[in-house]
């Protein structure tokens, strides 16, 4: 479950709650500055989702908030930016052509980035409009089109002639004729794209599956669903569920008591207060059980941004209709429920003079929107011209800045300009408040940045690099998977020939999840190859088991030395010192009561920010390890000694792998996927390329530009919000996700985690 700021609206975000883990960065209402007069801007990530992926729209959300602040905009949904007014300026470095694969393949070379930027997250592969998605820069359109600019007038919604039905996204998806209920259901691929919980997904181990049949028809019943949440010490938890049947009849409207201490009731959005929730005894498990009893096997759940509701409920259901996607706008725009209710149904909901949302009203509204769509069809919806209506509403709104969709518009509203330094501007439109400087090389971009960046409140500094050739990228990706597998595999022995294999498995499994134990047949005395799920477990086995007496034998525990593990010790050491892993410890051998025991003795673990407790995929049983994240490195070390002591008798060590890295490694496919029928001349393989390290080799490029960005970073003034984006790559042969790193620069010497 993710922790969000007190004023973050539940339905404003795109990234779902984490079902497995939570980062409990100290929220703004719990931060006490030792000297109130010395407030500083600070970042506090919430570790967003299970794979720590942040969408491009969410990046834009954060950047807009960095410019305008909470007086005009809602707070970001996926992280906390504390004391935004103390920011001096914003600098976004874009390393075009680089991806998460670059960063972890050349992890040792990116020394400055990994040691300095504590907050890292995955990015989806870039679209063709990457800059537009995060900043508001738009590619030039053909002469037949009408390019939209910051200065350009907004289209009038009252002119029927202005409606372009053919290019309306609803028409493009559904056509002109009325559609059936089953046609409106989200496909499995769409559910995956929009982060719905799915059976078998690594982030849904502890979710329950609602009963469902393999047959669904156009007569299957619809049920409107809406949830409200609060913020607790374990993140975001359910406080109210509303379920409505067709006809508007309310089947369920239950208050729910969270399992953990409530930090913020989010009353302005949920309407829930301490007094309301105090007498409640209903728990999440009770709601889950009731849903399984109430809903028939062919039930279709309907909601607005329904993925968020399902995740907070920790349920999986294959039959869903999401009104934010049913009434989709251009470029994937998702309209607010209040807007659709007013335009389509002609009614006002979530009135500003009313405290909190009415869950029944929201669920009923979503249900009515689906029924309207089914009755009148896509053509009728397209004729509303939702894009134009929304644009007019935003233009006429006195608080229009709240609805601004681009960073450029936010800057323009404050009379400020954006500086854009790049080699590639030919395909971009010009904007009155964007000063673009075209450079001939990355080196010139760097030189211009040193001079120009201090003069502008918002800066985009884009360096361009040649992406990896497809086959080279595939080989590197496969090598990465192999390297981590080999690093997570240990060899233990020799044992006696009559050793108890079950006993050995139990001993080694106590250090972390084991994927396989294999008897090595090439040795005279038995050795075992043990592959762990986590690098931490393998490293812990080497550190604690090597040289011990087991089954009557003194054993050696070590890794196999291969080309890919030659620098394993160095890599482990550097991973341990990664700023994201500082303050995080890995603990093995825990039982089901560990969490309760931990909370009961919380006084022994000051500065505890996160408890990460993964569960088994099928049984939903808690695994025998966890990660504990602390505010400081010192607090983590104190806690580690306590947990390894005589009272707790657990084993552990400093963390090595962040959650986004674990998720990325799991998703690396071993075989390349290429279009059929294409004959490709393979480039030189990686091992041959590395024999001659030329100046433009990726390894040298990574090292050189990490150093150059370091120098540029140190030239920035304190209070600068620095965001580094490796956007990822996307082409005919496949895609590679990107990586984001962010930090607010402090005074020199104050940037390290103590």
UniProtKB/Swiss-Prot annotation:
Disordered: annotated span: 1-36
Domain of life of the native organism: Eukaryota
Gene Ontology cellular-component terms listed: nucleus
Nuclease as UniProt keyword: yes
Molecular function terms from GO: exonuclease activity; RNA binding
Domain annotation RRM: ranges: 488-562, 583-662
GO BP term, pick one: rRNA 3'-end processing
Domain Exonuclease span(s) in chain numbering: 222-370
Alphabetized PROSITE patterns for the sequence: RRM
E.C. no: 3.1.-.-
SUPFAM superfamilies reported in the protein's UniProt record: Ribonuclease H-like (SSF53098), RNA-binding domain, RBD (SSF54928)
Top enzyme class: hydrolase
Keywords per UniProt: Exonuclease, Hydrolase, Nuclease, Repeat, RNA-binding
CDD domains: REX1_like
PANTHER family: RNA EXONUCLEASE 5, RNA EXONUCLEASE REXO1 / RECO3 FAMILY MEMBER-RELATED
Protein name in UniProt: RNA exonuclease 5
Species of provenance: Rattus norvegicus (Rat)
Lineage start: Eukaryota, Metazoa, Chordata, Craniata, Vertebrata
Gene assigned in the entry: Rexo5
